[in-house]
Amino acid sequence: MKVIIVAHNQLKLVQMEIEALRLLAGIEERDLIIVDNASQDGLRQWLEERPGINYLVCDEGRENYSTILNYAKTEFVTDEDILLLDPCYMILPDAIGEMQRLLYSDSTIGAVMPKVIQNGSESPSA
């Protein structure tokens, strides 16, 4: 599985997300693709210091989300599952395994979304 995280001026959140993925899901740096969407908070420099993390930088200005995802998929992903994460959301233990279980439970399913919990209450996924 590859994990794509798109961030704009969210260095601290990206750092926390990476640590949570490592601790809670066993995701290794080589399975991460971080996209710096024209940040000015030092994210690019931080990524350059981590040779184990795959990354892309939008240095000519912010790009739209679909363009970024298509480019990241073209550059780094083969036939593996892809998990798209916003650095504002944290993964709960076993959430990735549950999403994969649901994804493969029926051959007609092509994508799954997690439950979103805000302030301790489940919100419907959109």
What annotation goes with each model-predicted range?
Residues 94-125:
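Conserved donor NDP-sugar-binding/catalytic core segment of glycosyltransferases
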Residues 10-24:
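Short, well-formed alpha-helical segments that are part of the catalytic scaffolds
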Residues 18-19, 44, 70, 93-104:
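Short alpha-helix within the catalytic core of nucleotide-sugar-dependent glycosyltransferases
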Residues 1-2, 31:
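Cell-envelope/extracellular polymer assembly enzymes that use nucleotide-activated donors
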Residues 59-76:
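Glycine-rich, basic loop-to-helix element that forms the pyrophosphate-binding segment
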Residues 79-90:
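Short beta-strand-to-loop acidic/aromatic patch adjacent to the donor-nucleotide binding site
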Residues 2-5, 83:
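Short hydrophobic beta-strand elements that form part
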